[in-house]
C-alpha cells in the first residue's frame, strides 16, 4: 500500500514531464482583463473551477475510466474518453488534454506500463486515461487518486497565479493551504454526481480560454 501511495505522489508531481505547468486554462487572460487581480479573486476563480469542473466533469470521468479499465470494458472506456474530449469547450482546452495525453503515452511505458495500440490511442485522447490506467496498474485507491488529482491541478494553477497576478510565494502557499480544505468535499461530491449530469459549468473560464487563444502577449501555451 505504501508503494502505491508513492507511485501516486510521482504521478501528480509537478516535475512529471507532461507539460502541466505550460497551460493556464484561461487564467492568463482573466488576469490580463482584471477579472482576477488579487489573492481573493484568484481563490474565488479556482474554487469555482473545483466545484464547476473538477467535481462534476473530470473526477466523475476519472472514476468511470478506472472502474471500466479494471473490468476490461473497452467500449465504456472509449465512450468516456470521447466524452471527455467533447466536453472541452475551446480549442485551447482540447489541445491541452491531447498534448498532455501524448506526453503520458511516451512516459508510461518508461514507468513499466505497457500500452497496446488501443490503450495508446485512448491515452493520447485524454490525460485522464493515463491517470486511470496508472491507478489500475499500481493498485491506487480511487479516493486517493481523486484527491491527488485535484491537489496536482490546484498546485499547478496556484503557482501560475503567483507568477501572473503576481503574488508572493508565501501568499501562494497560504492559498493552497486554504483551498485544500475544499478537496475532501469536492471528491465526495464527485463520487455521487449523477452520470447523466456529468459536465462542466464554468462559462467564465471557457470565455477566458477562448479569448486567450488570440491574446497578444502570452506566457502560457495556447
From Swiss-Prot:
Pfam family, one: UreF
GO CC terms: cytoplasm
Highest taxon listed in the record's lineage: Bacteria
Quaternary structure note: UreD, UreF and UreG form a complex that acts as a GTP-hydrolysis-dependent molecular chaperone, activating the urease apoprotein by helping to assemble the nickel containing metallocenter of UreC. The UreE protein probably delivers the nickel.
Cell location: Cytoplasm
InterPro entries assigned: UreF, UreF_sf
Keywords: Chaperone, Cytoplasm, Nickel insertion, Virulence
Family per record: Belongs to the UreF family.
This protein's name: Urease accessory protein UreF
Main function: Required for maturation of urease via the functional incorporation of the urease nickel metallocenter.
Species the sequence originates in: Proteus mirabilis (strain HI4320)
Molecular function terms, GO-annotated: nickel cation binding
